[in-house]
C-alpha cells in the first residue's frame, strides 16, 4: 500500500514523500524508512495518524488502521540539546514574549506547548531581530536578488529604508506562515473520512507540486521566464517605410488606419468590407484595400489589406500574404525568406522595433498611448518628406 508522509522538521521546513509498504510492516521499520527519506533520526520522530500518535514500534501499520492512500504526519520531537542554551550571538532574547510564558503551563493542557516551538526554533535564524536581518540582506547581493524575485513585498519594504515598515511586513508574513502551518497540521490530523478536509489536503499538495515545479524550472530552464521580441521586418507600402509584424497565426493581413493615412491608401478603402475582427479581442474593420504594392528588399509584391480603426501596430503580415508568396520563417538565421523569389530579409532587433512592440513598452510606459505613437511617427514622416523636397530644389 502507498502511504503519504507529511514531514515537519524542527526548523519548520517541510517535505512530503510517499512510501510503498505492506500492511504487516512494523512501525519500527517504517520509522527507519522515514529516516532515510527525511534525514530525521528515528528516535526523534513522532508519527501521527487520525489525530492519534503511533507509539508501539512492534505493531504493524495495518493494526493501526492504515490503508492504501492514507496520509500520516511525521514531526521531529523537541530535544533539550536542540534548544539554544545561550542567546544567539548578536541577538537579544530578553525582550521576546513567548506565548504562554507569563503563566506556568498546566499539565492538563496538552495543546498549549505546540505553539512555542515554531517561534523558538526560528530565533537562531535572526528572524526575531528585523534590524539584523535587514543588514544581512543588504550586505548580500545574491540573497537580495533572490528576495526581489521570490518575495517582492518584503524586498520593497527592505529597500524603502524604513525599518518600521520592514519589521511590519516581516512580522505579518511570519504570522501568516505560522497560521498556514497550523492549518496544514490540523488538516493532516483531521478525520480521514472528512471530505472537506481531504479536498483541502489535495489542494495543498497540488500547490506544493506547483511551487516545486516552478522552482525546478527556475533552476533548470530560467530562460523560459524571459520574454522574446516579436518578428518585425522593414518594408515599404506605396513607397512609404513601414515596420511590419510577421504573424503566421493571423488569418489575414491588416493595417492600422493611421498607417494607411501615412501611406496615402485610404482613398482605396472599400467600406463594403467593413466588419469586426475577432481574435484575442475585437477590432472594428473599416474596409479593405484590394491591391497595394509592398516592397520587401528588392521585391515588389502585390498585397491586400484589411484596415482596422484602432490598431497599435502599423501593419501585420498574415497567413494569406505569407502563403501567397510561399514565405518561410527561418529562426536559425533570423530571416524571412520569400519563397517565390528567394529573397531574404532580416528580422529587426529590439532597438529598431516600433515603441509598442518593445519589451520596455508596457507596465512602465502606460503614459504613451498607441495613438500618440502613430501621431509622432506621422509627424516624423512628414518632416522627412519636407526635408527631401528641400534637398531636391535647385
From Swiss-Prot:
Arranged from A to Z, the UniProt key words for this protein are: Aspartyl protease, Chromosome, Cytoplasm, Hydrolase, Protease
Task: Please name the Pfam families in this protein's record.
Answer: Asp_protease (PF09668), Ddi2_HDD (PF24669), ubiquitin (PF00240)
Intervals of motif Ubiquitin-binding: 371-390
MF terms in GO: aspartic-type endopeptidase activity; identical protein binding
Q: Which residues form the active site?
A: 247
Pro residues bias: start-end ranges: 107-119
Where in the cell?
Cytoplasm, Cytosol; Chromosome
Q: Using the record, list the residue span of the signal peptide; answer none if the entry has no such feature.
A: none
Q: Ranges for the Ubiquitin-like domain?
A: 1-81
Q: Does the keyword Protein transport apply?
A: no
User: What's any one GO cellular component for it?
Assistant: chromosome
Which parts of the sequence are annotated with region: Disordered?
A: 82-128
- Report the top EC class in one word: hydrolase
Q: Which GO terms describe its biological process?
A: cellular response to hydroxyurea; proteasomal protein catabolic process; protein processing; regulation of DNA stability; regulation of protein stability
The EC number(s) given in the record are 3.4.23.-
Which PANTHER family did the record assign?
Answer: DNA DAMAGE INDUCIBLE 1 HOMOLOG 2 (PTHR15397:SF3), SODIUM-GLUCOSE COTRANSPORTER REGULATORY PROTEIN -RELATED (PTHR15397)
**What subunit structure does UniProt give?**
Homodimer.
Function of the molecule: Aspartic protease that mediates the cleavage of NFE2L1/NRF1 at 'Leu-104', thereby promoting release of NFE2L1/NRF1 from the endoplasmic reticulum membrane. Ubiquitination of NFE2L1/NRF1 is a prerequisite for cleavage, suggesting that DDI2 specifically recognizes and binds ubiquitinated NFE2L1/NRF1. Seems to act as a proteasomal shuttle which links the proteasome and replication fork proteins like RTF2. Required for cellular survival following replication stress.
UniProt family annotation: Belongs to the DDI1 family.
Name-wise, this protein is Protein DDI1 homolog 2
Organism listed in the record? Xenopus tropicalis (Western clawed frog)
Native organism taxonomy? Eukaryota, Metazoa, Chordata, Craniata, Vertebrata
Amino acid at each position: 500500500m502507498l502511504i503519504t508522509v507529511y514531514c515537519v522538521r524542527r526548523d519548520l521546513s517541510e517535505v512530503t514523500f510517499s512510501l510503498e509498504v505492506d500492511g504487516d510492516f512494523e512501525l519500527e521499520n517504517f520509522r527507519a524508512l522515514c529516516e532515510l527519506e527525511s534525514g530525521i533520526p528515528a528516535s526523534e520522530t513522532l508519527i501521527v495518524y487520525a489525530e492519534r500518535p503511533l507509539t508501539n514500534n512492534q505493531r504493524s501499520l495495518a493494526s493501526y488502521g492504515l490503508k492504501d492512500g492514507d496520509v500520516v504526519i511525521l514531526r521531529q520531537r523537541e530535544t533539550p540539546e536542540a534548544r539554544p542554551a545561550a542567546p544567539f550571538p548578536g541577538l537579544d532574547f530578553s525582550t521576546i514574549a513567548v506565548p504562554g510564558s507569563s503563566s506556568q503551563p498546566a499539565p492538563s493542557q496538552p495543546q498549549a506547548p505546540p505553539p512555542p516551538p515554531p517561534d523558538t526554533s526560528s530565533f537562531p535564524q535572526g528572524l526575531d531581530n528585523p534590524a539584523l536581518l535587514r543588514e544581512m540582506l543588504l550586505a548580500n547581493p545574491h540573497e537580495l536578488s533572490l528576495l526581489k524575485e521570490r518575495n517582492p513585498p518584503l524586498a520593497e519594504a527592505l529597500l524603502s529604508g524604513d525599518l518600521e515598515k520592514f519589521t511590519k511586513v516581516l512580522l505579518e508574513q511570519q504570522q501568516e506562515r505560522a497560521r498556514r502551518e497550523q492549518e496544514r497540521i490540523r488538516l493532516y490530523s483531521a478525520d480521514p473520512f472528512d471530505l472537506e478536509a481531504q479536498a483541502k489536503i489535495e489542494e495543498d499538495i497540488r500547490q506544493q507540486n506547483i511551487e516545486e515545479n516552478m522552482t525546478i524550472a527556475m533552476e533548470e530552464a530560467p530562460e523560459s521566464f524571459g520574454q522574446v521580441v516579436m518578428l518585425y521586418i522593414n518594408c515599404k507600402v506605396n513607397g512609404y517605410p513601414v515596420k511590419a509584424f510577421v504573424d503566421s497565426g493571423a488569418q489575414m493581413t491588416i493595417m492600422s488606419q493611421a498607417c494607411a493615412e501615412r501611406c496615402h491608401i485610404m482613398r482605396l478603402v472599400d467600406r463594403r468590407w467593413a466588419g469586426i475582427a475577432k481574435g484575442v479581442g475585437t477590432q472594428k474593420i473599416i474596409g479593405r484595400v484590394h491591391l497595394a504594392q509592398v516592397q520587401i528588399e528588392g521585391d515588389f509584391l502585390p498585397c491586400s489589406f484589411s484596415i482596422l480603426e484602432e490598431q497599435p501596430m502599423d501593419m501585420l503580415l498574415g497567413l494569406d500574404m505569407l502563403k501567397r508568396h510561399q514565405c518561410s520563417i527561418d529562426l536559425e538565421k533570423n530571416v524571412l525568406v520569400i519563397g517565390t523569389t528567394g529573397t531574404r530579409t532580416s528580422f529587426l532587433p529590439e532597438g529598431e522595433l516600433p515603441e509598442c512592440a518593445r519589451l520596455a513598452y508596457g507596465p512602465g510606459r502606460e503614459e504613451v498611448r498607441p495613438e500618440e505613437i502613430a501621431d509622432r511617427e506621422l509627424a516624423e514622416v512628414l518632416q522627412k518628406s519636407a526635408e527631401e523636397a528641400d534637398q531636391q530644389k535647385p
